[in-house]
A protein has these predicted regions:
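Short metal-coordination and nucleic-acid-contact micro-motifs, chiefly zinc-binding Cys/His arrays
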Residues: 57-63
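Short Cys/His-rich metal-coordination motifs, predominantly Zn2+-binding knuckles/fingers
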Residues: 68
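Extended alpha-helical scaffolding segments
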Residues: 1-51, 55-56, 72-454
Length: 454
């Protein structure tokens, strides 16, 4: 009937071809006083339409929806979610039951986790829309991070991904401006960013999802104010802050850069553990303790390579300051060299000085005491340091008088801070961390002085 009458209607005649070609149609209303509004904005109309939609399939199984809490027709199969990196190109399911072993109480398919047709359509449509917008999502390892603000402003997700993953300069934002914005938001102050005003009280959501064949798994789903997320990120950045080599131009270390410090870069598989990346992401965003696997991974790489890089030193510092915030750790794990009398820290500094003495006495040497003695000096100082100190005395004799006086003074000052009982027999894991930080600080001070002289 309508197909015969509608084309002849004067208001529809000109647009009928478009309307009849799979176009979307929105109904509106004009009140007697001339006001216009869309039918889709009226709560009563929306509820009536949804009620009709929920009961349109008489054969559909009804149950209480786990999302809306209302009795409605249950989605037997949920729509596919596309755009998750690493998942099937055709899409993957967040909720699916494709074998009897996964079902309970005689239910089939979606009835095992009842979600209404509307809710299934709504969450998959919204998630697909966000995944299609590269300003809202970022991949780190096998985890795809999707974030959004409650007011739907893209500036919030843009800023969060810059804070979290870097890449600010590629989007026309300087590192200094980004750091200033993060600091202001972490202190609860609104800032202007990307032609928008960021409100620290704005509700913000972060979802982490990972692919597994035809399914998706939720690594985390976090909700907080944008300002609280900013504070957690600022605290993380402050804990990571440490003196860096002159060649390292990075202002901040991204999550991926931190995870890479746990990987053997000479191995075939250079990807960090997906579980580690997910746990690290959650710890940073929530302000919670860092995962023990992060410390274990870094410690293993230091032992294997006998190298304390900026990233590894930053991880050690951040880990102990967050997970064990004692006054002693706050004294030892600082940004740059400090005069702490903590024995493991002093031993790390001493080892660096002994290595320098050897290098100055033997220019062009291919291997230093670090290659042979670092691990034993770090774990069992009493077995390594007596030999190293004796060796240093021989190296001092090869030097010119100014160098000999300079390094002898350094040795004397550091040795004076050690206990009268001598070198410790062994160091615990936290003490080994202090040793490695002391070694890193002293070594960076030496390199900084060398660069100034050049």
């Amino acid at each position: 009937m309508y197909k015969r009458q509608a084309p002849a209607h004067p208001l529809l005649a000109e647009q009928w071809a478009d309307l009849n070609n799979n176009a979307n149609l929105v109904f509106g209303y004009e009140s007697p006083d001339g006001a216009h509004w869309l039918a889709t904005t009226d709560d009563a109309i929306r509820d009536a339409w949804q009620s009709a939609f929920d009961t349109s399939d008489a054969d559909a199984e009804t149950a209480r929806c786990l999302i809306t809490g209302k009795e409605a027709g249950i989605a037997r199969i949920h729509p596919a979610i596309k755009g998750v990196m690493g998942a099937q190109a055709a899409g993957a399911a967040l909720v699916s039951f494709n074998a009897p072993a996964f079902c309970s109480y005689g239910h089939e398919q979606g009835a095992n986790a009842p979600v209404s047709e509307y809710a299934a359509f709504a969450y998959t449509t919204a998630l697909n829309l966000l995944l299609a917008d590269r300003n809202c999502c970022q991949r780190i390892g096998d985890t795809t991070i999707v974030c959004w603000a409650e007011n739907a402003s893209p500036a919030y997700s843009n800023a969060m991904l810059m804070f979290f993953c870097g890449g600010a300069e590629a989007r026309g934002v300087s590192e200094s401006d980004l750091a200033a914005a993060l600091k202001a938001l972490s202190q609860g102050r609104p800032v202007s960013f990307l032609d928008d005003k960021l409100d620290p009280n704005q509700n913000f959501y972060v979802l982490g999802i990972s692919p597994n064949a035809a399914r998706l798994s939720v690594r985390f789903f976090l909700h907080n104010s944008f300002g609280q997320f900013a504070k957690n990120l600022q605290d993380h950045a402050d804990r990571l802050s440490i003196t860096r080599p002159a060649f390292d131009k990075r202002e901040n270390l991204s999550v991926w850069a931190l995870a890479q410090e746990t990987v053997n870069q000479r191995s075939r598989d250079k990807n960090p553990s997906p579980q580690l990346v997910g746990d690290l992401l959650r710890a940073i965003l929530t302000g919670g303790p860092y995962p023990a696997t992060l410390l274990n991974g870094v410690t293993l790489r230091i032992r294997a390579e006998r190298e304390v890089t900026r990233g590894r030193a930053a991880i050690l510092k951040a880990y102990y300051l967050r997970n064990y915030p004692t006054e002693l750790n706050k004294e030892v794990f600082t940004v740059s060299l400090n005069e702490s009398s903590n024995v493991p820290y002093v031993l790390g500094r001493l080892f660096s000085v002994l290595e320098t003495i050897q290098s100055v006495a033997n220019p062009g040497i291919n291997a230093t005491i670090k290659d042979r003695y670092f691990n034993s000096a770090c774990a069992t100082p009493a077995t390594a340091f007596p030999t190293l100190v004796k060796l240093a005395q021989k190296h001092l004799q090869k030097m010119s008088t100014p160098n000999e006086v300079h390094f002898s003074k350094q040795l004397t000052e550091l040795m004076a801070q050690l206990p009268e009982t001598g070198f410790p027999a062994r160091l615990s894991l936290p003490e080994q961390g202090a040793f490695e930080i002391g070694y890193y600080h002293q070594t960076q001070k030496r390199f900084a002085k060398k660069n100034e002289e050049e």
